[in-house]
């Protein structure tokens, strides 16, 4: 039977991120992606001014209630950027309802980067996001978010292996079955992720070449590709490997083409290869 994932993210019309990345990538994995939009924006907010924004917080409980009235069940809940503590609480309640059956919860605690919280968030939001992460089976933080979640010091790349593993062990206090830590770099020429599989205690790493520039939306692309692979029955380490390869190919394609990275990376032309990876 086809798996179904509730993808809870905003919609940015331009930028190839959030739901506009999650829906096609998860669908390419052969998994149904049901969208619960948290907001609608004309573009993403990274290095772009003048964007429009419409908050959909008030619609989220009604969407959840309608789905529940129809008897819709989910094999996974996958949440990304949430704009307020109220949205975090709504998602937390939705997870509780979804867990009446077998349901994998995947949380990307999007709230910080490069050593700092996003400007619209504060320590209270971080505490609420930490509570949401405690309901997750898989957490996908970057280095900054991991440091916040486990109360550790943030350190700029390049990283020492001991530091990365201290973050993973700090996050092992969370009930999650796995932690996928993104933005890991042991040298200036590569970047990737560290994967803690708590069922075995194994830590594995996946790296790709680091290309010049800032590429918006790649965190969403990575997490969506990982979600699709995991729902297809791949292990968490296999899912992270596939997601890393897929994300790098999108960055490389964009870098070679020389297109404006503010408007997202070309992941679409890699969807066929992603499907093939899932069949390897």
Model-derived regions: residue spans:
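Conserved N-terminal subdomain of the carbohydrate kinase-like
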Residues: 2-107, 111-119, 268-272, 276
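Short pre-catalytic strand/loop immediately N-terminal to key active-site residues, enriched for Gly-Thr
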Residues: 13, 203-217
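Buried hydrophobic packing segments
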Residues: 22, 146, 223-230, 243, ...
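Conserved phosphate/ATP/ADP-binding segment of small-molecule kinases
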Residues: 119-203, 234
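Short, small-residue alpha-helix embedded
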Residues: 148, 213-236
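Phosphate-handling active-site elements
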Residues: 202-204, 229-243
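Charged C-terminal helix
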Residues: 237-280
């Amino acid at each position: 039977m086809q798996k179904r994932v509730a993808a809870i993210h905003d919609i940015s019309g331009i930028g190839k991120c959030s739901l506009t990345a999650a829906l096609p990538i998860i669908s390419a994995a052969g998994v149904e992606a049901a969208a619960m939009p948290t907001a609608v924006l004309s573009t993403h907010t990274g290095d772009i001014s003048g964007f429009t924004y419409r908050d959909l917080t008030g619609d989220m409980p009604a969407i959840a209630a309608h789905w529940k009235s129809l008897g819709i069940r989910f094999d996974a809940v996958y949440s990304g950027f949430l704009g307020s503590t109220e949205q975090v609480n709504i998602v937390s309640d939705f997870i509780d309802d979804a867990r009446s059956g077998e349901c994998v919860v995947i949380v990307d605690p999007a709230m910080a980067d490069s050593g700092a919280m996003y400007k619209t968030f504060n320590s209270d939001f971080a505490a609420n996001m930490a509570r949401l992460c405690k309901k997750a089976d898989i957490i996908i933080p970057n280095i900054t978010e991991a440091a916040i979640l486990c109360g550790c010091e943030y350190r700029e790349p390049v990283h020492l292996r001991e530091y990365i593993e201290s973050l993973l062990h700090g996050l092992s206090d969370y009930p999650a079955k796995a932690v996928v830590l993104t933005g890991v770099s042991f040298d200036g020429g590569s970047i990737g992720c560290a994967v803690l599989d708590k069922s075995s205690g194994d830590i594995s790493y996946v790296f790709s070449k680091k290309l010049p520039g800032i590429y918006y939306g790649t965190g969403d692309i990575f997490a969506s590709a990982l979600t699709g692979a995991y729902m297809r029955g791949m292990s968490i380490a296999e899912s992270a490997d596939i997601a890393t390869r897929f994300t790098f190919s999108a960055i490389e394609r964009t870098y070679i083409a020389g297109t404006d990275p503010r408007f997202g990376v070309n992941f679409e032309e890699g969807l066929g290869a992603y499907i093939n990876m899932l069949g390897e």
